[in-house]
């Protein structure tokens, strides 16, 4: 095999004088340790070392090294810090090949003879983990790695970027981060032309195009593109959560998840959106938030073409088509399509309600539920539709409303072909075919398909009308009744017929009106078979033409 000589300068890292000035004395010492560690890794590989004849005296060699640095400095304002720091003789070369190793105990003695690093190098060539974190009992082979790990406990972050103020625990991460400010992305994907700052990012990205997921979980069969993702996933099955937050006692499967969580207690939100000023504790949260301003929704459902900002939202949405519910409650066996829905449900069994409303005393399991509830008292509706200006208490209500403007109805009933804009409306409709009425009124025994219908019905017995119109003081049993009534005062008629442009203040009235154009008469008399467009027409017909029979 042909030899390919590799000089010491080939494994060194060059810095400009300006970059070197960024580092303080501690950082420079650490850099020396890192470079020394990198070099020992080369030594530990199957490389052979040869030395040129020692033609130069030590004094002359030092002169030439200094002259080399001065010439390099003049030429391109950079210098080889590796050689500058270690003062290693330039006569040593590394050659690839199958020659036998030199007959010495460890060739590293020739390199490390001027340093106290030989014991460290020998220890690194074994798998021994001599350095242990006493707090978490975690072992490390290198003292440098232990030092970096301990900074997680102490909170010391020594490497700060002068451009953006971001700080790093590990020096390599600091150097890696500085490339962000250059906007240089030299590694381009041939499949989609997407560019990356780091070669490792390109390699990870290219697996997406191949669709390959070589790492499979033996317990559930789920496959992953990366081994680290499989390792994280397997902790779900064993229920292992070894990392505990000392502030609140919450446990985590991964150490980094605990570190991210701890920012909640410290109130640290270093990542700020330049568009709206909103701050976030995690960089990934800021990245996802930015998509709101850009309107980017890269994850699209192939069945209904609905798009999402995040991939996990697409996965959860696809379960509405497949009916899959992988998250099951151990207490009652109820299953859910979303993990977050299961967590919310579990609080029913614990009966834990930590958040009390000061206005009415009602308690809630989550702070977000309390915030939403308080808007009933304040009347706040912060979410506005840009199409028609209508405002809503909850963002989810706004999303549901916006479908009206798109005319998109992706959820179709397989039995009758009727389509709906929301999956909840489809499920409600399907109960008509099933004939299910599981909700029974204890007062009169009447049954209903929906719990909301039962609650509305019960107000007949109680006489409760909690929703009052501020304009005329008229009271209603439901908030939807109040909303419809308000349109009398405002004159709003949001439901418009596409055939004749006639508008209505209620959707059911639009539906009734559209039968004029379609000729559909869905209301059929069971006595004589005569059909009608509207329910009230059928009622009138039955009273006048079949009144006697109905009374009998």
Swiss-Prot record:
It comes from Homo sapiens (Human). May be involved in transcriptional regulation. Keywords: DNA-binding, Metal-binding, Nucleus, Repeat, Transcription, Transcription regulation, Zinc, Zinc-finger. PANTHER family: PR DOMAIN ZINC FINGER PROTEIN, ZINC FINGER PROTEIN 154-LIKE. One of its GO terms (molecular function) is DNA-binding transcription factor activity, RNA polymerase II-specific. One of its GO terms (cellular component) is nucleus. Transmembrane segments: none annotated. It is found in: Nucleus. GO terms for biological process: regulation of transcription by RNA polymerase II. The keyword Chaperone does not apply. Its main location: nucleus. This is Zinc finger protein 404. Pfam families: KRAB, zf-C2H2, zf-C2H2_6. Belongs to the krueppel C2H2-type zinc-finger protein family.
């Amino acid at each position: 095999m042909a030899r390919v000589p590799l000089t010491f300068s080939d494994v060194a890292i060059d810095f400009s004088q300006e970059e070197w000035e960024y580092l303080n004395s501690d950082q420079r010492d650490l850099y020396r340790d890192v470079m020394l560690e990198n070099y020992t890794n080369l030594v530990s590989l199957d490389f052979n070392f040869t030395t040129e004849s020692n033609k130069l005296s030590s004094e002359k060699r030092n002169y030439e090294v200094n002259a080399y640095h001065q010439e390099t400095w003049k030429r391109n304002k950079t210098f080889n810090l590796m050689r500058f720091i270690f003062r290693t003789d330039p006569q040593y070369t590394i050659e690839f090949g199958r020659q036998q190793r030199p007959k010495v105990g460890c060739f590293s003695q020739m390199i490390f003879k001027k340093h106290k690093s030989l014991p460290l190098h020998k220890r690194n060539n074994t798998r021994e983990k001599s350095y242990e974190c006493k707090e978490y009992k975690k072992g490390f082979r290198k003292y440098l790695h232990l030092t970096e790990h301990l900074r997680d406990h102490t909170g010391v972050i020594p490497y700060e970027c002068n451009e953006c103020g971001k700080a790093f625990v590990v020096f390599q991460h600091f150097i890696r981060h500085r490339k962000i400010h250059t906007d240089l992305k030299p590694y381009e994907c041939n499949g989609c032309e997407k560019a990356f700052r780091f070669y490792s990012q390109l390699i990870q990205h290219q697996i997406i195009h191949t669709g390959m997921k070589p790492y499979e979980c033996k317990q559930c069969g789920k496959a992953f593109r990366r081994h680290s993702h499989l390792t994280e996933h397997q902790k779900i099955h064993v229920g292992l959560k070894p990392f505990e937050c000392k502030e609140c006692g919450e446990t985590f499967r991964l150490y980094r998840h605990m570190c991210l969580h701890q920012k909640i207690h410290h109130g640290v939100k270093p990542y700020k959106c330049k568009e709206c000023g909103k701050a976030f504790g995690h960089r990934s949260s800021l990245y996802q938030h930015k998509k709101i301003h850009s309107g980017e929704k890269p994850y699209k459902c192939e069945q209904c073409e609905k798009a999402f900002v995040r991939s996990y939202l697409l996965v959860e949405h696809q379960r509405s088509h497949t009916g899959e519910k992988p998250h099951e409650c151990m207490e009652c066996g109820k299953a859910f399509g979303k993990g977050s829905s299961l967590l919310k449900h579990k609080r029913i069994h614990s009966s834990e309600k930590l958040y009390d409303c000061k206005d009415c005393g009602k308690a809630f399991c989550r702070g977000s539920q309390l915030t939403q509830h308080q808007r009933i008292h304040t009347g706040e509706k912060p979410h506005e539709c840009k199409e028609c200006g209508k405002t809503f208490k909850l963002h989810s209500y706004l999303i549901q409303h916006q479908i009206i403007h798109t005319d998109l109805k992706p959820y179709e009933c397989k039995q009758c072909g009727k389509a709906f804009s929301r999956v909840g409306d489809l499920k409600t409709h399907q109960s008509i075919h099933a004939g299910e009425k599981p909700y029974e009124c204890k007062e009169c025994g009447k049954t209903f398909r929906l719990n909301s219908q039962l609650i509305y019905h019960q107000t007949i017995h109680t006489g409760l009308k909690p929703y009052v119109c501020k304009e005329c003081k008229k009271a209603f049993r439901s908030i939807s009744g109040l909303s419809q009534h308000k349109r009398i005062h405002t004159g709003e008629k949001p439901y418009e017929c596409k055939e004749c442009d006639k508008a209505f203040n209620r959707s059911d009235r639009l539906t009734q009106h559209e039968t004029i154009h379609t000729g559909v008469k869905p209301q059929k008399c069971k006595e004589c078979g005569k059909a009608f467009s509207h329910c009230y027409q059928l009622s009138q017909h039955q009273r006048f033409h079949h009144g006697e029979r109905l009374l009998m």
